[in-house]
Amino acid sequence: MSIKVFGTKEVQDLLKAATNLEGKGGNARSKQIVHRLLSDLFKAIDDLDITPDEVWAGVNYLNKLGQDGEATLLAAGSGLEKYLDIRLDAADKAEGIEGGTPRTIEGPLYVAGATVHDGVSKIDINPDEDAGPLVIHGTVTGPDGKPVAGAVVECWHANSKGFYSHFDPTGAQSDFNLRGAVKTGADGKYEFRTLMPVGYGCPPQGATQQLLNVLGRHGNRPAHVHFFVSSDSARKLTTQFNIEGDPLIWDDFAYATREELIPPVTEKKGGTALGLKADTYKDIEFNLTLTSLVKGKDNQVVHRLRAEVAA
């Protein structure tokens, strides 16, 4: 059946009425966006001859997505969050902004409220027998290449089971395990003493994995570490690096991998003096370069709902 009704006056009037496009009240921008999205959906139903059963399967899926609390996870897995980064990269290019550590997705598992320490923070609060010690360190520099004092570097990552604190279904981690924040001094240096993470997979019975199964895709990420870097003198940086050697680096279901964000992992001695769980530890140097404000403003601050806990 190839029924085409999208272009009819009846359907176009319905779209205008459903979104109150030409009516008073409401928010004009919201009307514009919803009208466009609803129009695209209606047209897709026409073009693909989507059946009522398929439409209601989609509606039921949205209910499950909300019940599972996985909308932000699906935003990563569907490529939506990566697409936003592609647009931001293009906007930077159009503005002539070059250099800086590449951005990549934030993901769904940040928790605000970590205590900010000066320069160094040991963030492995809970013991983890299966994870070896790791030191992550580097220098925050500005667009001029000089160290940035007073920058706040936030870091968060999974444990050896692939779970993030605060969201851990086993309840084995305190809220800020493997999460921390440090403020740089005049030398721009930061350091986190932690444990080696592993990658994670989507909850196997969750809505995100349900859709990925239909698409014939896996829902796994390589081992990685997230960062926010904030400074009054530069734009906020949202980035992450992958752990070198992980087999999923170039098969990340969230499309967050970038060539410049795979720093080498080296082995060092002297961990005992640093308060680590063993004398031999892994070391990752990850320098962070910020970019200039645009007309005196930080246009990289994204407003979205995030978990927050008092440290």
Swiss-Prot record:
It catalyses: catechol + O2 = cis,cis-muconate + 2 H(+). SUPFAM superfamilies: Aromatic compound dioxygenase. Pathway: Aromatic compound metabolism; beta-ketoadipate pathway; 5-oxo-4,5-dihydro-2-furylacetate from catechol: step 1/3. Gene3D superfamilies: Aromatic compound dioxygenase. CDD domains: 1_2-CTD. Pfam families: Dioxygenase_C (PF00775), Dioxygenase_N (PF04444). One of its GO terms (molecular function) is ferric iron binding. GO terms for biological process: beta-ketoadipate pathway; catechol-containing compound catabolic process. PROSITE patterns: INTRADIOL_DIOXYGENAS. Belongs to the intradiol ring-cleavage dioxygenase family. Can cleave 4-methyl-, 4-chloro-, and 3-methoxycatechol at lower rates than catechol, but has no activity with 4-nitrocatechol or protocatechuic acid. This is Catechol 1,2-dioxygenase 1. It comes from Acinetobacter lwoffii. The lineage of its organism: Bacteria, Pseudomonadati, Pseudomonadota, Gammaproteobacteria, Moraxellales.
